[in-house]
Amino acid sequence: MTTNIVLETTMGSLILELYTTHAPKTCNNFTTLVRRGYYDNTIFHRIIPNFMVQGGDPTGTGRGGSSIFGEKFEDEIDPGLKHTGAGILSMANAGPNTNGSQFFVTLAPTPWLDGKHTIFGRVKSGMGTIKRMGLVKTGSEDRPVEEVKIVKARVVEEEEQI
């Protein structure tokens, strides 16, 4: 069974396909946080052109967020999964085994992240939205000048057509 997540953002919708076989604990964390409304009305606090779009911090600072397992949990690195191009969904971290709630989507190949960040999905639909996000004007700490927000995140139920 494939798990899909819809992120309704201020710039358009994204459908994320989660890699539940490769990163079950990470996908469980993300899906549970989505169901709890954890990501609703949070911002993408860091956007770097030709690199990535990062969100998932309820404080909006890039220093907050926690997992359903407590503050942090361990990496689930699958050597078969690589940051090969735009649209890879991966966990943001502050070093090994420091996953919480923050995530990023790549805007280009980022091979230097391989083996350091848990890849747990991909953008299934909405690459145009992600690419537009990557072009927004940013200020200090790569923070968008105008907020880019997740208005609502939801799990697509099995019977639902997407």
UniProtKB/Swiss-Prot annotation:
Keywords: Isomerase, Rotamase
GO cellular component, one term: catalytic step 2 spliceosome
InterPro entries noted in UniProt: Cyclophilin-like_dom_sf, Cyclophilin-type_PPIase, Cyclophilin-type_PPIase_CS, Cyclophilin-type_PPIase_dom, Cyclophilin_A-like
GO biological process, alphabetically ordered: protein folding
Ranges for domain PPIase cyclophilin-type: 1-155
UniProt EC number: 5.2.1.8
Reaction catalyzed: [protein]-peptidylproline (omega=180) = [protein]-peptidylproline (omega=0)
First-tier enzyme category under EC: isomerase
MF-aspect GO terms: peptidyl-prolyl cis-trans isomerase activity
Pfam families named among the record's database cross-references: Pro_isomerase
PANTHER family recorded: PEPTIDYL-PROLYL CIS-TRANS ISOMERASE-RELATED, PEPTIDYLPROLYL ISOMERASE DOMAIN AND WD REPEAT-CONTAINING PROTEIN 1
Homology family: Belongs to the cyclophilin-type PPIase family. PPIL1 subfamily.
Free-text function comment from the UniProt entry: PPIases accelerate the folding of proteins. It catalyzes the cis-trans isomerization of proline imidic peptide bonds in oligopeptides.
Protein name listed in UniProt: Peptidyl-prolyl cis-trans isomerase-like 1
Organism in which the protein naturally occurs: Gibberella zeae (strain ATCC MYA-4620 / CBS 123657 / FGSC 9075 / NRRL 31084 / PH-1)
